[in-house]
A protein has these predicted regions:
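Secretory-pathway luminal glycosyltransferase catalytic domains
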Residues: 7, 52-201, 205-206
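Leloir-type glycosyltransferase catalytic cores
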Residues: 281-301
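Short beta-strand segments
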Residues: 40-42, 169-173, 210-215, 275
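A short, glycine/small-residue-rich beta-strand->loop->alpha-helix junction that serves as a flexible
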Residues: 13-22
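A short beta-strand-loop structural module common to alpha/beta enzyme folds
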Residues: 36-47
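Short amphipathic alpha-helix
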Residues: 23-30
Length: 301
C-alpha cells in the first residue's frame, strides 16, 4: 500500500508528556497494524496555556493534522453527541473518517477491531493508559520514544552516575497533585510510607542499591533523598528526567503516566518496577478499574 492510498490514524492529543505518550503509543500500534500513516491533532492545546505538544523532539514519525481549532459545526456536533451519552469528541476541520472514543479507563477490547477496516481513516480519542493497546509492538513504541538524541548535555553527564546494576530511580509526583484541588481530588499525592516500603523491598534484594530521587519539586526531592539515604537528580527538562530514569536498573514509580513511562522505557525484561496500588485518589479509585494500567510483571504496593 503506497503512502497516497494508505489510511490515516489520527490521534487527538491532550494532557502532559506522559498522557501524550500513551495516546501516541496506541496510535502507533494501530497505524502499524493497518499499514496507515500516523497523524496527531493538536487542537486541544490551542485553548489550554498550561500544556503543549511535547513529542516533537522524539522520532515518533507522526505528521500534524493541518487546520485550526474545531469550528462551530464541529463544536455543535460534539455537544449533540455528548448530550446523547457519547464522549463529545470534536472532529478537527476536514475530518471525514471514523471516530473512536475510549469508553472507559480500563482496556477496551473493541480497540483491536479498528484495524479490521484497512481502508478507513480513524480518529482515536481517549487516554489509552495500558500497554495492552500496543501489545506485541513494544519494541516499535520504545524505538519511536527514544529520547537519547534529544536530551541535554547536562543529562548526558548525569547518565554516567546511573550506570551499573545498583541504580534505583524513585519518582515523586508533586506539582498539581498537591497545588491544584481538582487534580488532587482525582490523583492524590502518595504518602511517604509507600516509598519507604518500596525501598525496603528494593534493598532486601539489592543491599547496595544507589537511590536517585526525581521529582517536579526539586527541593522536596532533595529532602526525601536525604532521609532515604539517596541523592536527588534533575535533568534540564521533563524529557531529560524521563530518559535518565529509564536508564536505572530498578524503578519506584508514582501514580503518574509520566512516571509509568520512565519505567516502561527501560527495555530490560528483568527490570524491577514497583508501582502504587493507589493509582487515583480514593473517591476516584472507587469508580475506576485500574488493573490494566500495570504490566503483569510489575509489583504493586
Amino acid at each position: 500500500m503506497d503512502a497516497s492510498s494508505a489510511p490515516t490514524v489520527l490521534v487527538q492529543l491532550h494532557g502532559g508528556l506522559g498522557n501524550q505518550l500513551f495516546q501516541a503509543a496506541a496510535g502507533l500500534a494501530l497505524a502499524d497494524r493497518m499499514g496507515a500513516r500516523l497523524m496527531v491533532d493538536l487542537a486541544r492545546f490551542r485553548d489550554r496555556s498550561l500544556r503543549g505538544y511535547a513529542l516533537a523532539p522524539l522520532p515518533v514519525g507522526a505528521q500534524i493534522w493541518p487546520g485550526g481549532s474545531p469550528g462551530m459545526i464541529e463544536r455543535l456536533r460534539a455537544r449533540f453527541d455528548k448530550a446523547r451519552g457519547g464522549k463529545g469528541v470534536r472532529r478537527p476541520p476536514g475530518w471525514r473518517g471514523r471516530v473512536h472514543a475510549e469508553p472507559h479507563y480500563h482496556y477496551d477490547p473493541a480497540f483491536e477491531a479498528l484495524s479490521g477496516d484497512l481502508s478507513g481513516d480513524v480518529l482515536i480519542a481517549g487516554f489509552f493508559q495500558s500497554a495492552r493497546y500496543f501489545a506485541g509492538r513494544e519494541s516499535l513504541v520504545r524505538a519511536r520514544f527514544d529520547a537519547s538524541g534529544a536530551v541535554s548535555d547536562h543529562a548526558r553527564a548525569c547518565a554516567a552516575r546511573l550506570a551499573g546494576e545498583a541504580s534505583v530511580a524513585v519518582h515523586i509526583r508533586r506539582g498539581d497533585y498537591v497545588n491544584d484541588p481538582r487534580a488532587a481530588a482525582v490523583h492524590g499525592a502518595l504518602t511517604e510510607d509507600y516509598y519507604l516500603r518500596a525501598l525496603d523491598h528494593v534493598r532486601a534484594q539489592a543491599p547496595h542499591a544507589r537511590v536517585f530521587v526525581f521529582s517536579d519539586d526539586p527541593a522536596f526531592a532533595a529532602s526525601c533523598a536525604a532521609r532515604w539515604g539517596g541523592e536527588s537528580m534533575a535533568g534540564a527538562s521533563a524529557l531529560d528526567d524521563l530518559w535518565l530514569m529509564s536508564l536505572c536498573r530498578r524503578h519506584v514509580i508514582a501514580n503518574s503516566s509520566f512516571s509509568w513511562w520512565s519505567a516502561f522505557l527501560d527495555p530490560r525484561p528483568d527490570a524491577m518496577v514497583i508501582a502504587p496500588v493507589q493509582w487515583f485518589a480514593p473517591a476516584m479509585m472507587a469508580k475506576t478499574r485500574v488493573e490494566d494500567v500495570y504490566p503483569p510483571h510489575w509489583l504493586r504496593m
